[in-house]
Structures are given as C-alpha cells and as structure tokens.
From Swiss-Prot:
Protein's cellular compartments: Cytoplasm
Pfam families in the record: FKBP_C (PF00254), Trigger_C (PF05698), Trigger_N (PF05697)
GO cellular component: cytoplasm
Organism for this UniProt entry: Delftia acidovorans (strain DSM 14801 / SPH-1)
Name the record gives this protein: Trigger factor
This enzyme's EC code(s): 5.2.1.8
Entries under SUPFAM superfamilies matching the protein: FKBP-like (SSF54534), Triger factor/SurA peptide-binding domain-like (SSF109998), Trigger factor ribosome-binding domain (SSF102735)
Length: 436
C-alpha cells in the first residue's frame, strides 16, 4: 500500500486510508453468517434464522464492527510502512468524495518527537552523601524506648510537664457556640509532642490534676477543620489525670525484646546502624536521582505530543479523585477539579519519560536480570523472612516491572553522574531525613 503522510503542524500528521467496498461487504456477509449459526430468535430454530432477518437485526452493528477493524488494520499497516511511531490514539473520520468502489478515511494523529538529549558533560549535578553516626543511632534508640514506655500516675501536687500523658475534659466555643470536634471527655495526649495545637499544650503544661482553666485558642488559617480555620475559640479544660513516662533501660532485656539474636546492646546498635544505612542509601539514591532527572530535563530539546500530555493529565486527575474518595470526600468523582492545575506536572512527566526512554535506548541502559534480582534481594533484606518477600516480587509481573523501572532509573542516574560536572555535598543524617 502506497502511503502518503501529510504534516499538519509540528508533531501532527494526516494519512488517507482507502478501503475496497467489496472487501468490507464480503467481511460483513461472512460475519453475519457466523451470527446466523448461533443466534436465537423467537419463531425460528437455532441456525435456521433467514439471513435477511439476521441482517435486519444485526447488520448495522456488524458493519460498524467491520469498519472499525478494517480501518484499524489499514492504519496500523500504513504507519508501519511509513515507519512512524504514533503518540496516542488517532482521530479518524470518513472522507467524502471517495473514488467509486472505495471508502476513504482520514486519520489525524501525532508522532513521537525527536529527542535531543543535549550535552551532558556541561550539566551540573549536586551529588549528596550521608553517613550514619552515633547521634543517629542514639536518636533511634530513644524512639524505640518511647515506643515501649509505660506510664505511672503522678502525685496530686505534681504539675504536667513535657513527656507526661494527661487525661482531660475540654470544650471549645466560637461566638458562644460549641463546634464540631470542640468537645471531649477523658481525652488523652502527650504534652510537648505536638499532638495538640501549641496554645492548647501551653495551657495544660503546668496544671495539676483537678484544675480547670479557660484560655483563647486561635486556629491557623490552614487548619484542616475548615469550619474553624482562622477563627478564635474560647476553651475550658479540666485536667483529670497526669501520668509520668517511664522509659525502659537500654540493656540486654531491651535488646532481646526487640528481637536482637545475641541479645546484647552492641548487637542492637549494630542492627540499628545496618537498617539506618539501608534507609540512608535509598534516600541518597532518591535525592541524587531527582537531581539527575532535573539536569536531563533542563538539557533536552523536544516537542511534547499533546495526546500524551492530555493522557497524563487524565491519569493525574483520576488519582486526585481517588485520593479525595479515600479521605471520605462526598461525591469526589463529581468534584470540579480544573485540569490545568495538573498541566505543568503532566508536561514534566511526559518530557522526562521521553528523555529517559531515549537515553536508555541510545546507551543500552536496560535493566539486566542480574540487576533486577539484586534489587529484589536488597528490598527483601529488611524483612524478617526475605525469601518469602523475594518470592512475592518474582511471583507477579507487575511488581517485577516496577522493580525493573527503578533499576533503569538507577542505571540512568549512574550514567549521567559519570558524564556530568558533579559536586559532592555531605549532609547530616537529620538533614537527609528532613528532621533538621
């Protein structure tokens, strides 16, 4: 088939598809005969329905089905012969004035763009490094102790201090009216750990069991409760009980309780360091990967297929609606969400996907079976039964595809870091974890 491709603009192309009418009619007749063999109609025995009746009942739908198939096959053959890589679905319409004995259709579509990676040797990338020090291990030990703390009631004369667990009754009013969520009895929280708004904690800190206090509380403008956000409430709080925290000693019993095989404090700290180093490795890889992807996007030159961007916007919009549903938002599927909100993110995702795909193709950065196996084993290593976790990954193609994608991104990251102008930057454990 001779294929003529017309360029409309940038990535948009048009192809005219010609189909012999006798070929279409022959296929319609064949399919109607197949329908006639199995169709059941009142007044006729199976397989004995006259073709005229079958054609009257099913002719339109069969013809529509045949046209769809024939046009789809012709389009696939045409773009294959023209060596075109199509982006998105074509818009196909019937063309008027076709030669006798033919049906003609116009297919308008976009092609995948030429991707120019750019000069990676001029790209500047900041590469992070981080170490697990004793302070990070100490902080993790403190967290583990807090997770296993017990509480004992304080003496009547004692006041509430940071770290104490308090039991309170409270009631808040705005303009003299109690609001939703503003009243509770026997409510417990830990003082000084950010579980309540700062003004609430400040009011309770220093109170004794049995005491009551009134105080104003200004809700932040971005408070999650929209009915009270930006407003000031008058609260009455009564402290009913104050309990002091008792932290377990860091000893052999503590280590054994945490599943340390040899049951020593040294073994516990070694296990913690190993786990933290694994987490640091993944965090550093993630941050460095992001820096590399930013550099790739900034250096690359390409046109974005509108169809691909629109498809990505639709995916992001669907994800946003699903998140709203998970939050319990009523009629989330009908919520009016402007699509242009997602446009910058969609364009970046499409751009990055095309650039990475071209870099992988041009430099053979595909994931090898050994790399995939090694990454699965690394992911599984942090679990109690790594063999079971590894089998879980290898037992599902979708999960393995996700691992493969990560490995490819790692290959791309290492490749770019080997070409770019890299400056090393050491960060602390807390900075890396966002705790500084």
């Amino acid at each position: 088939m001779a294929v003529t491709v017309e360029t409309l603009e940038k990535l948009e192309r048009k192809i005219t598809l010609s189909l012999p009418l006798n070929s279409i009619q022959s296929e319609v007749e064949n399919r109607l005969k197949q329908v006639a063999r199995t169709v059941k109609m009142d007044g006729f025995r199976p397989g004995k329905v006259p073709m005229s009746v079958v054609a009257q009942r099913y002719g339109y739908s069969v013809q529509y089905e045949v046209l769809n198939d024939k046009v789809g096959e012709a389009f696939a053959q045409a773009v294959n012969e023209a060596k075109l890589r199509v982006a998105g679905q074509p818009r196909i319409s019937e063309k008027e004035g076709a030669p006798e004995g033919e049906a003609q259709f116009e297919a308008i579509f976009e092609v995948m763009p030429e991707v120019k990676i750019g000069d990676l040797t001029s790209a500047e990338v900041e590469k992070l490094t981080a170490e697990v020090d004793d302070a990070a291990i100490d902080k993790t030990v403190d967290i583990l102790r807090k997770q296993r703390r017990t509480f004992a009631q304080r003496a009547q004369a004692d006041v509430a201090v940071d770290g104490d667990r308090v039991t309170v009754d409270f009631e808040g009013k705005i303009d003299g009216e109690t609001f939703s969520g503003g009243k509770a009895e026997d409510f417990q929280f830990l003082v000084g750990e950010g579980q309540m708004l700062k003004e609430f904690e400040d009011a309770v800190r220093g109170m004794k069991a049995g005491e009551s206090k009134t105080f104003p509380l200004a809700f932040p403008a971005d408070y999650h409760g929209k009915d009270v956000a930006g407003k000031t409430a008058d609260f009455l709080v009564t402290v009913k009980k104050i309990e002091a925290a008792n932290l377990p000693e860091v000893d052999e019993a503590f280590a054994k309780a945490l599943g340390v095989a040899e049951g020593t404090v040294e073994g516990l700290r070694a296990d913690i360091k190993k786990n933290l180093e694994r987490e640091v490795k993944f965090r550093v890889q993630g941050r460095n990967k992001q820096a590399v992807m930013d550099a790739l996007v900034s250096k690359a030159e390409l046109e974005l297929p509108k169809a691909s961007v629109q498809a990505e916007v639709a995916r992001l919009l669907e994800g946003a609606r699903a998140e709203l549903q998970q939050r319990g938002i009523k009629d989330a599927e009908k919520a009016e969400i402007p699509e242009d909100v997602f446009l910058p993110q969609a364009e970046r995702r499409v751009r990055l996907g095309l650039v990475v795909a071209e870099l992988v193709r041009a430099n053979e950065l595909h994931a090898t079976p050994d790399q995939i196996k090694a990454h699965v084993e690394e992911l599984a290593a942090s679990y109690e039964k790594p063999e079971d976790v590894a089998r879980w990954y290898f037992g599902d193609r979708q999960r393995l595809a996700e691992v493969e994608a990560v490995v490819i991104e790692n290959n791309v990251t290492e490749f770019v870091l080997g070409k770019a102008k890299v400056s090393d930057k050491a960060v602390s454990f807390d900075e890396l974890m966002g705790q500084a």
